[in-house]
């Protein structure tokens, strides 16, 4: 009887762990979609990756929700870029129920279209994702960088 209990417990823990990993991978996929769009300098359709009431913070400032950030920050900024490339990208995600907490670390290089100047930075982003109708969406994103 003791052996059956131990086996059942181990199986239960394994199933829980697998489910957590699957959810973490799904949240990571959302972050990857956003990262890939930024690298392409084409964020068309990325609104679907964010909650309507999302909050975006960048380098100490509040950028409003994602729609506002896209219209007043990313959109205009991308017009000045020739390229944007992430390097050394790492992401860690912890899932707790309908919320996922992510930390991304990376370096990036931006090439400015006007004069081909390179801007090199190290960055970190923290995000809170929320499961909405079965899909992970970015609810809060905070990123900062340094030379």
Where do the PLM segments sit?
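Sequence/structural signature of outer-membrane beta-barrel proteins
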Residues: 109-113, 147
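A short acidic/glycine-rich loop-to-helix N-cap element
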Residues: 114-120
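Short beta-strand edge/turn micro-motifs at domain boundaries
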Residues: 122-147
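A solvent-exposed, acidic/Ser-Thr-rich amphipathic alpha-helical stretch
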Residues: 43-95, 105, 117
């Amino acid at each position: 009887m003791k052996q059956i209990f131990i086996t059942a417990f181990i199986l239960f823990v394994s199933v829980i762990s697998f489910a957590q990993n699957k959810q973490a991978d799904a949240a990571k996929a959302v972050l990857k979609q956003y990262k890939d769009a930024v690298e392409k300098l084409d964020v068309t359709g990325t609104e679907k990756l964010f909650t309507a009431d999302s909050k975006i913070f960048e380098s100490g400032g509040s950028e409003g929700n994602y729609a506002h950030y896209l219209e007043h920050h990313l959109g205009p900024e991308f017009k000045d870029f020739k390229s944007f490339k992430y390097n050394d990208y790492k992401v860690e995600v912890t899932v707790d129920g309908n919320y996922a907490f992510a930390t991304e670390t990376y370096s990036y290089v931006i090439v400015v279209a006007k004069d081909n100047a390179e801007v090199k930075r190290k960055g970190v982003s923290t995000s809170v994702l929320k499961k909405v109708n079965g899909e992970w969406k970015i609810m809060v994103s905070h990123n900062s960088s340094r030379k």
